[in-house]
Amino acid sequence: QMGLGSLNTVATQAPANLTIVCIDNGTHGETGGQEGHTAQRTNLAMIAQGSGIPSVKEITSADQIADAHDFIRNQPGPRFLWCRVLPGDPTAFKRNFNPAECRIAFRNAYLGA
């Protein structure tokens, strides 16, 4: 979970090699599936842009994945990619909260390793 202040910090520090990927189903799935703010009016892309993140993109369907890939590879960083997905049932397994392991798993999935 990332607080909104993190976007301000990223914009201020401006790491060119950073992409924040926010996968948002509009719900709080782990606490019962209540609707979150983004299910209504909160627009994370506008918040990221207002924080000073230079490259911001929102995708809402699987056919935009190639565009998202191009965005990550070609736009100046830091980048914020807001992936809006459909809500679903919570996973039946416990999540891994180890940041190093999550980073490696995400990188391997992204690179097709």
Positions of PLM-derived features:
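Conserved thiamine diphosphate
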Residues: E35-D70
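Short, hinge-like loop/turn segments at secondary-structure boundaries
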Residues: A11, G36-Q40, N74-Q75, N98-A100
